[in-house]
């Protein structure tokens, strides 16, 4: 993969009114289905207790969620960009970026043998590379060390033949979750780490036999060995957790392992005159909770709306893009709070059960907030509905206009850190967070987030109806308007609502 895919930007060709949208990639036969986020706690040398598991199943109306097979989804988006006028330069490495009063010069060359250097002029540069960002290196933008509290390293590959956890767990039916583990993203939790099992073959229409497999763990607890290959180290971890190991009986890897050092990196600055470090070029935290594409697309939305205006008046100053900076840094900061809390809590189930609810309880209103803007835009085509999303005090928080949620998240983080430091027991920390959830008027009581015994959250259509009533009528004002307008938008969208959701 090209480590320096720095791209010069120019305005895309506008889509003609009435033009058909490109094929939606969400139902491709190489993608898996993502019906839930599933979590099972494991201890060294023991069988997992089925009572120490949590699951957030997605409402059926949202079941177009996918385990995206990235080589296909990325190819899809690349060809959409080419369709709209982007000039593709595959295997092209940027070696230098120079700025002047009139624009930017990006210099590099193709990876083909004997290729000559090339230079491209642009008005603005979006560096969407990653850890080895050319702009971060040029302007010395990296924090050293990364400013995040969270620590982890990772190893990952693709397998064939990974068994369904439902088939190897040995758990009785009455203690299993309502959605099969195999139908979603499986997180096997260990002390300060987690395995992921992400199948692409978990529905009848799949034509992809692969399964994404990985292990992410705190590198301070598990220093990276110098005398083992990643495959050998992974095998040693499997030997510690018998139920996870059974999933790999007879399975085979189909690509080489990738093994990282510490994953976390951050930047002092992500926006400047005529440039942007976008998403993974700006920083990275951890794959837990699958925030990568979501964060990227939030930044794309905020950045492109401003770029289109800049192309009209020629103002590419950092001041114009100041909100993008706050959004990028906020996305990383708030993710650090919840992921660090989660890693601390993995070894104590009650504490994890509490942190799980802080994370999960605001996914639905966060999604509703975005969908409400789409529904309103669908009705009148007014772009202001998207601009209004940015009118909040906490960019990057997944419910960004809620002071109450920010306080809940930060208090959860502080409580977990006290447990980590030995100032609280795990049960004391869990009690504090459960009381915060129970006392909070903005935490949805309908799904079961306030009920410690309800470990599997599986909202039916009827439950969604009760939730929308609560959100529209009984919830605090910051939720009421979203609930009412979301419900009204669904009614007005009629048969097209599923596409908009």
Feature-to-residue mapping (PLM):
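N-terminal FAD cofactor-binding segment of flavoenzymes
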Residues: 1-43
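Helix-loop-beta segment of a Rossmann-like dinucleotide-binding subdomain
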Residues: 46-70, 105, 216-220
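Predominantly flavin-linked oxidoreductase catalytic cores and closely associated redox partners
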Residues: 75, 79-243, 300
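FAD-binding beta-loop-beta segment adjacent to the flavin cofactor pocket
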Residues: 256-278, 283-287
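A conserved FAD-binding loop/helix module that cradles the flavin
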Residues: 285-304
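Active-site-proximal substrate-binding core of FAD-dependent oxidoreductases
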Residues: 301-356, 370, 374
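Long, charge-rich C-terminal accessory regions
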Residues: 347-448
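C-terminal non-catalytic accessory extensions
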Residues: 405-501
């Amino acid at each position: 993969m090209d480590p320096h895919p720095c791209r010069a930007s120019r305005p895309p060709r506008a889509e003609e009114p009435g033009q058909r949208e490109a094929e939606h990639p969400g139902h491709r036969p190489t993608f898996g289905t993502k019906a839930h986020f599933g979590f099972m706690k494991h201890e060294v040398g023991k069988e997992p207790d089925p009572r120490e598991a949590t699951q957030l199943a997605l409402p059926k109306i949202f079941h177009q969620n996918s385990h995206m097979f990235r080589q296909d989804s990325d190819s899809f988006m690349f060809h959409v960009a080419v369709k709209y006028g982007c000039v593709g330069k595959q295997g092209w490495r940027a070696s230098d970026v120079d700025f002047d009063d009139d624009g930017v010069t990006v210099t590099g060359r193709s990876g083909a043998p004997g290729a000559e250097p090339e230079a491209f002029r642009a008005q603005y540069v979006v560096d969407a590379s990653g850890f080895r960002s050319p702009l971060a290196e040029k302007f010395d933008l990296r924090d050293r060390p990364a400013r995040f509290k969270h620590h982890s390293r990772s190893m990952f590959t693709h397998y064939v033949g990974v068994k369904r956890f439902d088939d190897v767990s040995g758990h009785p039916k009455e203690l299993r979750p309502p959605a099969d583990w195999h139908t979603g993203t499986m997180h096997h939790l260990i002390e300060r780490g987690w395995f992921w099992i992400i199948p692409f073959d978990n529905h009848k229409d799949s034509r992809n036999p692969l399964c994404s497999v990985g292990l992410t763990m705190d590198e301070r607890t598990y220093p990276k060995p110098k005398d083992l290959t990643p495959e050998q180290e992974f095998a040693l971890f499997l030997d510690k957790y018998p139920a996870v190991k059974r999933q790999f009986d007879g399975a085979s890897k189909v690509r080489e392992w990738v093994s990282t050092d510490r994953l976390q990196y951050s930047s002092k600055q992500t926006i400047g005159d005529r440039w942007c470090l976008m998403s993974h070029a700006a920083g990275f935290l951890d794959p837990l909770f699958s925030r990568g594409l979501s964060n990227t697309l939030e930044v794309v939305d905020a950045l492109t709306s401003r770029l289109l205006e800049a192309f009209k008046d020629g103002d590419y100053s950092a001041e114009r893009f100041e909100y993008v900076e706050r959004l990028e840094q906020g996305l990383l900061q708030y993710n650090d709070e919840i992921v660090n809390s989660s890693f601390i809590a993995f070894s104590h189930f009650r504490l994890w059960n509490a942190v799980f609810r802080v994370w999960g309880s605001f996914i639905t209103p966060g999604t509703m907030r975005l969908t409400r803007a789409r529904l309103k835009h669908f009705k009148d085509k007014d772009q202001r509905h998207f601009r209004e999303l940015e009118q909040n005090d906490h960019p990057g928080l997944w419910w960004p206009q809620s002071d109450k949620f920010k306080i809940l998240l930060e208090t959860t983080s502080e409580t977990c850190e006290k447990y980590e430091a030995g100032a609280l027991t795990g049960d004391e920390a869990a009690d504090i967070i459960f009381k915060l959830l129970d006392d909070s008027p903005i935490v949805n009581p309908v799904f079961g987030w306030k009920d410690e015994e309800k470990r599997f959250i599986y909202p039916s259509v009827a439950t969604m109806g009760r939730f929308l009533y609560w959100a529209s009528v009984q919830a605090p004002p910051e939720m009421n308007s979203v609930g009412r307008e979301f419900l009204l938008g669904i009614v007005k969208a009629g048969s097209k609502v599923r596409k908009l959701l």
